[in-house]
Amino acid sequence: MHKSNSTYFSDMDISRTHLFTAIIRNGIRKHSRLYGAKKNAVAGAVGATEGTRGKHYIALGGISCLFKKEILPYKKYEMWTRLLCWDNKWFYLVTHLVKPGVGQPKSWALQPWKKSKPAKDVDPEKLKGAIYATAIAKYVIKRGGITVPPETALIDADMVPAKPEGWVYQEAATEEHESNGDVLPKAVDAKDWNWDVIEAERLRGLKVAEHFAAMDGMHDFFDGGKEGVLGEFADLLY
């Protein structure tokens, strides 16, 4: 016996909702009438295009999960969720279900009162060995029928700074090549996260997310049975 695979998805929904609302919380707050925003200011909430009508909502566009190890009954586990990247429409979030205690956060941005253990290098293989499952999901913000671009929403939520006028991404200035050919952003402090660093990290995650996005092409494989089928099988006897 083990934890039902179907329950992973409802658990991860909770984790992703916590993270995503935390990411855009300032955009929600600054335009909410509950926090003193005037009625005419509410119309421009969370990066919406001026003149559009309709309420904002967040929609899940798809999810894929890779199961690595079973979780035995009553076994504790942790969910670690992060924003992987974004493109012109979608936010891509990754969630790991892992053995408790394997992760040691360097800091707690929204909970500064929590104590952090001294930073130390952790064996990547040990981290991978602690993973039960990993999932990727994509979310979109809509205002009525209009898509709110992720970058616009992040700027509106004060999560990233506005791009400098005339800014162009310079790969060599922000990335370093490891001996195995991997390209990784250089380690930086939070205060150093300018658009060069942000874009380097976004593109690193997008290399994985693009494969997930390509799965939209699977819709094209439905042919309505034009070449014949094995049969029709109902789950009820009528």
Predicted regions and their residues:
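Short hydrophobic alpha-helical module
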Residues: 15-18, 100
